[in-house]
Amino acid sequence: MRIAIDARKLHDFGIGTYIRNLLKYLARLDRETEYLLLCRPQDVKLADGLGPNFRAVVEPSRPYSVAEQVMLPARLVMQNVTLLHEPHYVLPPLVPCRAVVTIHDCIHLMFPQYLPNRLAYAYARANLWVAAKRAERIFTVSETSKADILRYC
């Protein structure tokens, strides 16, 4: 099995911490499954030290961009990925494999005044909806977040 983990948000605060801990503990627990870490060019050495079953693959599309909607699925095809784990709420509808997604919260939808404009709100809401409907499993952090996901999706 070849699992891709989207690690492009490695340096973000909450999601970055989640990704770093996920990789740290997966490396301790699983030495057999092949993991592809989709990362930014500056993080190409991300897999070093995790184990021989971890490999970094550069994914240059920016998170939350229109480009990732096309480039990410294409990268998954090129890498023959079996399962994608998205550690944030964006899961392009054209993803060619099974997928799981982590949705930490819906704060950006609950407080849209902190987004740059209405288009950003619509994009965020559409991406959350697609991710929730498309993913085989959703990981979340609490019953409150679960209730919010159900409300917005």
Model-derived segments and their meaning:
Residues 1-153:
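Carbohydrate transferase catalytic cores enriched for Leloir-type hexosyltransferases
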